[in-house]
């Protein structure tokens, strides 16, 4: 459960292992369809990797950690907080804050509090920091800090065609938060002819060159009707900052395209040079993701890219 991939250019990714590789970490007995693990988030702080997520089939929200991302992860540290889509934020003073969906005094929204990420112990009062920016189902929260501002980014509108991503900011981690005047920062809700739809549930990152990116979910429709057969996929889009707010893509309207021009990192590495092709329409070199799969079934052990539905039952192996 929860595969970990590594990349030098944000386009070509190699599977390196799994955060959850044993039943003591991941109990999936009697797991229903669309059950199990929801929305994992990975963070790194002072030599430690953290992965926080929800097992909706078991005991809810938990965090695991490791100093070596290519080795085993810890046993789960369970967190006494309901809701889904948890995330961690480490402030300048090393305090760690948890945020997820939740309910405080009957009000549903985004809940935050200080936490010990190694043990899951809650260290402060739980507070409702946002009810969203007007869309239904505010979820998938992430907190960032940039230039003295705390930014709270959340998904809204549900996970179908009204999906979108909004952002707010405050000088205090607990708010009050003011909404970006140009929200949503990404959405294809009003662009039904776009090949990409249902964009949202995003995370921001800054690369080694100081360039910003948005990684998010979306779907690719395959006909004039809003139909798709691959489900929600992972997308990447360039981000620039204007007037203290992130602007996604280059269209100025919160939409992206399947092919975009952006300064990717690591273009001089071997993984990049092996996957650069000339675009037939523009004649320009484009870095493509390599989706090819080559598995040798003569090996004694199964390839780590193969997964078993729910907890493995070795009695069914041949």
Model-derived features: positions:
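Carbohydrate-active catalytic/glycan-binding domains of CAZyme proteins
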Residues: 1-318
């Amino acid at each position: 459960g929860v595969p970990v991939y590594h990349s030098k250019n944000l386009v070509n990714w190699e599977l390196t292992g799994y955060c959850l590789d044993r039943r003591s970490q991941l109990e999936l007995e009697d797991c229903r369809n669309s059950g199990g693990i929801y929305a994992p988030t990975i963070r790194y702080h002072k030599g430690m990797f953290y992965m926080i997520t929800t097992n909706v089939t078991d005991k809810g929200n938990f965090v695991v950690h490791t100093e070596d991302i290519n080795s085993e992860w810890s046993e789960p540290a369970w967190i006494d907080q309901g809701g889904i889509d948890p995330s961690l934020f480490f402030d300048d003073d090393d305090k760690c804050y948890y945020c997820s969906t939740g309910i405080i005094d009957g009000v549903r929204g985004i809940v935050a509090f200080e936490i010990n990420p190694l043990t899951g112990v809650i260290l402060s009062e739980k507070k409702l920091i946002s009810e969203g920016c007007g869309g239904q189902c505010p979820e998938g929260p992430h907190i960032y800090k940039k230039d003295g501002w705390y930014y709270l980014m959340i998904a809204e509108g549900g996970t179908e065609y009204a999906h979108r991503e909004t952002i707010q900011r405050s000088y205090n981690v607990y708010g009050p938060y003011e909404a970006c005047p140009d929200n949503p920062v990404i959405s294809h809700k009003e662009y039904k002819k776009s090949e990409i739809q249902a964009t949202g549930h995003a995370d921001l990152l800054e690369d080694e060159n100081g360039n910003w990116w948005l990684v998010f979910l979306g779907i690719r429709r395959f006909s004039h009707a809003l139909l798709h057969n691959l489900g929600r996929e992972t997308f990447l889009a360039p981000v620039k900052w204007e007037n203290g707010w992130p602007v996604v893509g280059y269209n100025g309207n919160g939409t992206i395209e399947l092919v975009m021009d952006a300064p990717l990192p690591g273009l001089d590495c071997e993984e990049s040079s092996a996957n650069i092709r000339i675009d037939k329409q523009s004649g320009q070199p484009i870095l493509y993701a390599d989706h090819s799969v080559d598995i040798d079934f003569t090996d004694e052990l199964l390839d780590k890219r193969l997964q078993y539905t729910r907890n493995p039952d070795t009695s069914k192996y041949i």
